UniProtKB/Swiss-Prot annotation:
Gene it is expressed from: dad1
Stretches of the chain found on the membrane's Lumenal side: 52
Disulphide-bridged cysteine pairs: none
Record protein name field: Dolichyl-diphosphooligosaccharide--protein glycosyltransferase subunit dad1
Pathway(s) served: Protein modification; protein glycosylation
Positions of transmembrane segments: 31-51, 53-73, 93-113
Length: 113
């Protein structure tokens, strides 16, 4: 069983490296960074506690919101989804991402107090 899992993962990585555009790889690295940041914040919450609760919630909401916005950006700039987003150029999608991210972080900073 482990041989088949290893072969599936190996094939997935080979196809990912060969067929994924560089823009999407960079965005995937950003998504991984945000995911790890959110996981570390949650682990910290479990181990240490949530004494400054608003700060913890703000950081975690920022991680989750940024992850969701980045996934939406990835969907919009993926060349395979070009038919679904005909009226939206990659530059427009990135501008929308920046605007939504700015609004998200204004809310997060306001929530901290």
């Amino acid at each position: 069983m482990s041989v088949s899992v290893f072969s599936v993962v190996s094939r997935f990585l080979d196809e990912y490296v060969s067929s994924t555009p560089q823009r999407l790889k960079l965005l995937d690295a950003y998504l991984l960074y945000i995911l790890l940041t959110g996981a570390l914040q949650f682990l910290y919450c479990l181990l240490v506690g949530t004494f400054p609760f608003n700060s913890f919630l703000s950081g975690f909401i920022s991680s989750v919101g940024s992850f969701i916005l980045a996934v939406c950006l990835r969907i919009q700039i993926n060349p395979q989804n070009k038919s679904d987003f005909q009226g939206i150029s990659p530059e427009r999608a990135f501008a929308d991402f920046l605007f939504a991210n700015t609004i998200l972080h204004l809310v997060v900073v306001n929530f901290i107090g």
